[in-house]
From Swiss-Prot:
Its cofactor is Mg(2+); Mn(2+); thiamine diphosphate. Belongs to the TPP enzyme family. MenD subfamily. It comes from Shewanella loihica (strain ATCC BAA-1088 / PV-4). This is 2-succinyl-5-enolpyruvyl-6-hydroxy-3-cyclohexene-1-carboxylate synthase. The keyword Cytoplasm does not apply.
Amino acid sequence: MQIEKTAELNLLWGSLILEELARLEVQHVCMAPGSRSTPLTLAAAKQTKLKQHLHFDERGLGFLALGLAKASRAPVAIITTSGTAVANLYPAIVEAWLTQVPLIVLSGDRPPELLGCGANQAIVQPAIFADYAKQVNLPTPDMAIPPQALLTLLDESVANAKGPIHVNCMYREPLYPGSMSADFTHYLSPLGNWQHSALPYNQFADAQLVSAPTSDALARFVHGKGVIIAGTLAPEQQPEQLIELAQKLGWPLLTDAQSQLRQHGAAIGNIDQLLLQPKAKALLQEADTVLVFGGRLLSKRLISYLSEQKWKRYWQVLPQQTRLDPSHSAKQVWISPLAAFAQLPWPRSSEANWALQLIEANEQLATLFQQQIDDAEFGEAQVVRTIAGRGEQQLFIGNSLPVRLYDMYAPITPIAPRVFTNRGASGIDGLLATACGIAAHKASSTTLVIGDLSQLHDLNSLALAAKQQGTLVIVILNNDGGNIFNLLPVPDEKLRSGYYRLAHGLEFGYGAAMFGLPYNRVEDIVSFNEAYDDALAYPGASVIEVCVAQDQASEQIARLAAWIKQS
């Protein structure tokens, strides 16, 4: 009877954990199969408040959870068994920590007596994620530990989470309960009204510090030639407020690819390429004041401009306290929601409209890109611009070359997509799985633009794509290797080819077929547009493989840069 009660108590603790997470605003739980996590899996299977997502590969599962958390703006739970299953989550946890996305890992574990003695599938799991996750270690379930102790520990750990949390859950066998004959009424009685409410046992107010300058400080700050820079911003931060702020101050708004404003007609979205133009760069160098929202800028030219300019006044606005400035500039950092800071009583700048010429220069580049990309030879930049110009949808842009092409050449459009990236650690792993999570939250129409090596990294996440209920278009830019290295100063072409680009000669048609996904291979823009139209109308995931020459993108980038420098 006592052995049977162990299994039932394991399940009870699992049920308490999943119920409390649901009350702490968790909407999704991602699970991989495994025995040691059975108490958590069985509890999740019975939990009607959480949407379940299952996948056989823990590495992809972690990135799926990352995408769900990005799209839902809420914590996402992940359940894994013991051993290397937990370790496979590491890349996603690193990305989540760097970008402050809340993931809650619930890892099943062996009890203490089975660690370090040769027991099967047993590794030291506490602190496996080092500094990249907050660590919570639960003992094996025990009637001597009151349930309210478990709930308060979860509440304090998860409430207002700004990054990953690892809850390690030790369980003794048996793991599979039988008749559920144990009566836990007395054990649960201290929980009182919690059993009949929908609120967490402990409710923690958000202790977020909010800071704002005085009216006098605002007046002093805007006295000069200023620029506003929009870094990485989420759609929910209301980045469009920066358009109004820029117009009020009379300062140019320079926008990063991840700002949600890269394609806005009132912003200077072509800033990366404008910094190649001598006249535009000289004008920007007249600025003495900068107001930065967010961080993690993509463009090296914009990063260099920000770090090399001699600023008299430098303010950065962040939603929470962190360091997002690799140049380590002297500045005032304000902790504030973007919208609240933009809506302060800003006076008009004494140097309003000092950089109006940038608007014309930005529009001239837009015309150049239309002529030399849209109306020129088929290539990667042409495909990226075509996708970005399709209006309202979710757009996940892969790392390496795709996101840089978007940053350099995205079109100015009246309606732009919601842009997502994984630019914390900027890895090329897990990109398809992340896009699947973003698409799955509300089954919203989503396009992923991904390079061929990135897709090879995450090939088995096509199984996740096959489960999509909404439109997910997977556009693979296949230039046969890591051809971003064509843009880097590798000293020898033989070294570049043999040690960096790693041409593979592979195509993705059979991979798509293996997972039952519709597939099109295209080599011209007419075929791409036809395939893309069909894919956007399809209620599920589909694959479009864009086949281009290895040097097409790098040669076009160099050619455009040469023209811009001479203009």
